């Protein structure tokens, strides 16, 4: 069969008739889409570059790391408030990837015989992170934003769906498999990624007097997570699926994967108060912070490892989570900021959708306040904002594409509180 000689892009493989433009050179071609992609990567300061000598991709490990201040500034663009948590995360993430750079340099020096076996080196420990904060306070968003900034693979898991190996449900190796998939099965890239495990508080031991029956999703899962955090070699089936006898498995070392775990830890405030206040005796003592988000946040800031052990986390797991960052409960003002200020703010997203229909979407100040107030009432934090806006605009988004004269859509407090239709002009 004759070889197809139709010119095609050397980068994406698209043929000349599949793109708007194809720029040809002697030995290579590039299409307009790849040019646009490269331009975007340069403008965004993408940290992946290609080595000109051997064509291998060099990650940010060979480049200058963003400083904690630069990491914090990037987080500020997407996450409102949570200043203490952002600072703690920025330092922890910076130190973690600095540790990987040191390890990579050490390995290279040994490879080139620059270091002998007896040369003393300070071994840097991994700083895994525990995030404590109410639902919808930004724990997941912080982890996702960090991974996106560093351009590393990211995988997320819900601790409540995990079981011990051998039981029905997801085991810890499934999380590593998700990370490997996010890295397009590039093992080296996956081993530099970030894993976020949410709802870690839901797998706490139910008390000091544990039942002798098998704890499928409690302490056993904590022990399995401990192996992942400490560093283990996970055997992953190629391209997903189940393990089979005589199957060649992909070996992934988790020693250098940054593990972030988070949870709301409802009831932890009582444990802390019992320790810090002499007037609070036992779990039935009145907790003043119950309806006071600010006071609850202040209590969380006083958390100690012993409180987490009493809550139900095993000591070995807590010992592997040296960085503890607490997030505050978001108030109405913060929720209003979240609606409009971040780079990917919910209001901006819907305004863009309406622009595509040649209509301008706007929210009154009272309308924004009503959205934030409703989210506060639902106790869903920032997580509940989108559903409120979606419900308010559902009928309008259904009708708008069929309307030729709609140029302006206004959402006020009546739309949110009374279910009235947005004003269309």
UniProtKB/Swiss-Prot annotation:
The keyword Nucleotide-binding applies. Disulfide bonds: none annotated. Signal peptide: none annotated. GO terms for cellular component: HslUV protease complex. The keyword DNA-binding does not apply. Residues 1-50 form the ClpX-type ZB domain. Zn(2+) binds at residues 9, 12, 31, 34. SUPFAM superfamilies: Glucocorticoid receptor-like (DNA-binding domain), P-loop containing nucleoside triphosphate hydrolases. GO terms for molecular function: ATP binding; ATP hydrolysis activity; ATP-dependent protein folding chaperone; protein dimerization activity; unfolded protein binding; zinc ion binding. Keywords: ATP-binding, Chaperone, Metal-binding, Nucleotide-binding, Zinc. ATP-dependent specificity component of the Clp protease. It directs the protease to specific substrates. Can perform chaperone functions in the absence of ClpP. One of its GO terms (biological process) is proteolysis involved in protein catabolic process. This is ATP-dependent Clp protease ATP-binding subunit ClpX. SMART domains: AAA, ClpB_D2-small, zf-C4_ClpX. Component of the ClpX-ClpP complex. Forms a hexameric ring that, in the presence of ATP, binds to fourteen ClpP subunits assembled into a disk-like structure with a central cavity, resembling the structure of eukaryotic proteasomes. It comes from Psychrobacter sp. (strain PRwf-1). ATP binds at residues 134-141. It comes from the Bacteria. Pfam families: AAA_2, ClpB_D2-small, zf-C4_ClpX. Belongs to the ClpX chaperone family.
């Amino acid at each position: 069969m004759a070889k197809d000689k139709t010119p095609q892009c050397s980068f994406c493989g698209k043929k000349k008739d599949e793109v708007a433009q194809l720029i040809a050179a002697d030995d290579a071609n590039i299409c307009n889409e790849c040019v646009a992609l490269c331009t975007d990567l340069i403008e965004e300061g993408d940290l992946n570059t290609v080595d000109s000598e051997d064509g291998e991709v060099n990650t940010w490990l060979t480049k200058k790391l963003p400083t904690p201040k630069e990491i914090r500034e990037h987080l500020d663009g997407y996450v409102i408030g949570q200043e203490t948590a952002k600072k703690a995360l920025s330092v922890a993430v910076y130190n973690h990837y600095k540790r990987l750079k040191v390890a990579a340099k050490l390995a290279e020096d040994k490879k080139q015989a620059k270091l002998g076996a007896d040369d003393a080196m300070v071994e840097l420990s991994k700083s895994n992170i525990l995030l404590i904060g109410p639902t919808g306070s930004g724990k997941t968003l912080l982890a996702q934003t960090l991974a996106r900034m560093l351009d590393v693979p990211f995988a997320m898991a819900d601790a409540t769906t995990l079981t011990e190996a051998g039981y029905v449900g997801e085991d810890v190796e499934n999380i590593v498999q998700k990370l490997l998939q996010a890295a397009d099965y590039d093992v080296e890239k996956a081993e530099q990624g970030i894993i976020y495990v949410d709802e870690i508080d839901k797998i706490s031991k139910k008390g000091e007097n544990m039942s002798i029956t098998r704890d499928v999703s409690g302490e056993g899962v904590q022990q399995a997570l401990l192996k992942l955090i400490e560093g283990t070699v996970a055997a992953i089936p190629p391209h997903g699926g189940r393990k089979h006898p005589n199957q060649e498995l992909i070996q992934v070392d988790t020693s250098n994967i940054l593990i972030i775990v988070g949870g709301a830890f409802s009831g932890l405030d009582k444990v802390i108060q019992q320790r810090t206040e002499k007037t609070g005796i036992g779990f039935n003592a009145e907790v003043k912070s119950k309806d006071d988000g600010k006071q609850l946040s202040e209590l969380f800031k006083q958390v100690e490892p012993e409180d987490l052990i009493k809550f139900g986390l095993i000591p070995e797991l807590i010992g592997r989570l040296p960085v503890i960052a607490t997030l505050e409960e978001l108030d109405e003002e913060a929720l209003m900021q979240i609606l409009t200020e971040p780079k990917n703010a919910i209001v901006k997203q819907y305004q863009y959708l309406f622009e595509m229909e040649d209509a301008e979407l706007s929210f009154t100040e009272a309308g924004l306040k009503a959205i934030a107030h409703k989210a506060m009432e639902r106790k869903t934090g920032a997580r509940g904002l989108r559903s409120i806006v979606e419900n308010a605009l559902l009928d309008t988004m259904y009708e708008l594409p069929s309307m030729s004269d709609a140029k302006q859509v206004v959402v006020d407090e009546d739309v949110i509180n009374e279910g009235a239709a947005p004003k269309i002009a």
